[in-house]
């Protein structure tokens, strides 16, 4: 379910070779991502691989709460899914499922573009409910985009970014 009163775009361009594609109910290709026990540990805090039922329930939940997208990378002239992200004011779960794309700054690019989307929609603040204390890469990605640690949670930390504050003067000065 998209954000109430907002039409979810079919695609959002992130860079020349990265885009977000609106969830369309097809996710079989993502099954292999959630077989990676290290990835599952970073996402869920345990190492139990997903079965198709669990994957279906996860995507149904995310789609019901925000704008669910697959992160796609252009490879040999065609886009292919490499991860997923869900955007809403209360959380921004993101996964780079294809391990060959991890550590390349793609998560940071996606987070930055969704911060921009939040501003476009007039949101004053975005939140991340919890990043596990041991998921240092995710903490760094969100912090590098301007998110601030908000509170300690049961297993890590929550984060937020105030979208009403802008770094530096973004407008031309008035010479009057």
Please name every model-derived segment.
Residues 67-82:
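Conserved beta-hairpin
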Residues 1-49, 53-57, 165-176:
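A short, well-structured alpha-helix characteristic of acyl/acetyltransferase catalytic modules
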């Amino acid at each position: 379910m998209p954000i109430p009163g907002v039409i979810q775009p079919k695609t959002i361009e992130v860079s020349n070779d990265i885009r977000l594609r609106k969830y369309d109910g097809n996710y079989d290709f993502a099954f292999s991502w959630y077989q990676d026990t290290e990835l599952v540990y970073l996402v869920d805090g345990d190492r139990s691989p997903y079965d198709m039922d669990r994957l279906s329930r996860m995507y149904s939940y995310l789609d019901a709460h925000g704008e669910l997208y697959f992160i796609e990378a252009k490879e040999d002239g065609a886009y292919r899914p490499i991860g997923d992200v869900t955007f809403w004011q209360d959380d921004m779960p993101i996964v780079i499922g294809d391990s060959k794309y991890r550590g390349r700054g793609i998560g940071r690019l996606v987070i930055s573009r969704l911060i921009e989307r939040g501003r476009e929609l007039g949101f004053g603040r975005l939140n991340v409910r919890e990043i596990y204390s041991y998921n240092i890469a995710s903490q760094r990605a969100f912090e590098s985009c301007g998110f601030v640690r908000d509170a300690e949670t049961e297993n890590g930390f929550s984060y937020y970014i105030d979208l009403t504050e802008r770094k530096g003067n973004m407008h031309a000065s008035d010479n009057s």
